Amino acid sequence: MAGLNSLEAVKRKIQALQQQADDAEDRAQGLQRELDGERERREKAEGDAAALNRRIQLLEEELDRAQEQLATALQNLEEAEKAADESERGMKVIENRAMKDEEKMEILEMQLKEAKHITDEADRKYEEVARKLVILEGELKRAEERAEVSELKCGDLEEELKNVTNNLKSLEAASEKYSEKEDKYEEEIKLLSDKLKEAETRAEFAERTVSKLEKTIDDLEEKLAQAKEENVGLHQTLDQTLNELNCI
């Protein structure tokens, strides 16, 4: 009777050990699956981090190109402003010359008025009219010649002033164009800088995620090793119990 009770106890112990072994095996398989899942997530996170790094590199290259274009546009704008300043100085010189010609014209008009006044006075004195008329005709002729020369000069000055004005308008249009390009490039650089900062933030987050996943995997690997050791111990105990049973 005592032998049967001992045998039953051994069987129950075997069953309990077998159940522990099965449970340990299930835990080990579960930990292995969890470890595989964590490895897959780590590989995916590493792939995302690599893609973000490539994206950051592309954004940096695009930012460099935009900065080079902006530098070129600023240089062209500076040259256009210098040309506009030179044209403005030239226009002031022409305006001064035109003012001098206008002064000469006023003097000629005064001389002409004086000649007319003398002519009016000559009407009252016939003899003086005849003598003074010859003088006045000569003076009037010379005055008309000077007036014609002044008119020709004024025409040339007006044409030159028109050309300078047209050139100045062209330079102003070019300056506005370069200013618009400069604003556009600055806006593009701002957008690229924002994208670069966002990509860097995402890359830092991905790197922290990879570190956490690596820590989780290390912990799971340690737990798996412990479970395997427990499983080996249970199998050894089970084998020892079976040997004892066979001896009985």
Curated annotation (Swiss-Prot):
Single GO MF annotation: protein homodimerization activity
SUPFAM superfamilies on file: Tropomyosin
Segments of this protein annotated with the region Disordered: 18-49, 78-97
Pfam families registered for this protein in UniProt: Tropomyosin
Entry's Gene Ontology cellular component terms: actin cytoskeleton; cortical cytoskeleton; cytoplasm; podosome; stress fiber
PTM annotation (Phosphoserine): residues: 6
Protein's UniProt keywords contain Calcium: yes
Residues modified to Phosphothreonine: 216
N-acetylalanine: residues carrying this PTM: 2
Basic and acidic residues bias: start-end ranges: 33-47, 79-97
Alphabetized UniProt keyword annotations: Acetylation, Actin-binding, Calcium, Coiled coil, Cytoplasm, Cytoskeleton, Metal-binding, Muscle protein, Phosphoprotein
Coiled coil location: 2-248
GO terms of biological process kind: platelet formation
Transmembrane segments: none
Keyword Oxidoreductase: no
Residue list for modification N6-acetyllysine: 177, 215
Cellular location(s): Cytoplasm, Cytoskeleton
Gene3D superfamilies: 1.20.5.170, 1.20.5.370
Superkingdom, taxonomy of origin: Eukaryota
Free-text note regarding domains: The molecule is in a coiled coil structure that is formed by 2 polypeptide chains. The sequence exhibits a prominent seven-residues periodicity.
Family to which the UniProt record says this protein belongs: Belongs to the tropomyosin family.
Function statement: Binds to actin filaments in muscle and non-muscle cells. Plays a central role, in association with the troponin complex, in the calcium dependent regulation of vertebrate striated muscle contraction. Smooth muscle contraction is regulated by interaction with caldesmon. In non-muscle cells is implicated in stabilizing cytoskeleton actin filaments. Binds calcium. Plays a role in platelet biogenesis.
Protein name: Tropomyosin alpha-4 chain
Natural source organism: Mus musculus (Mouse)
Gene behind the chain: Tpm4
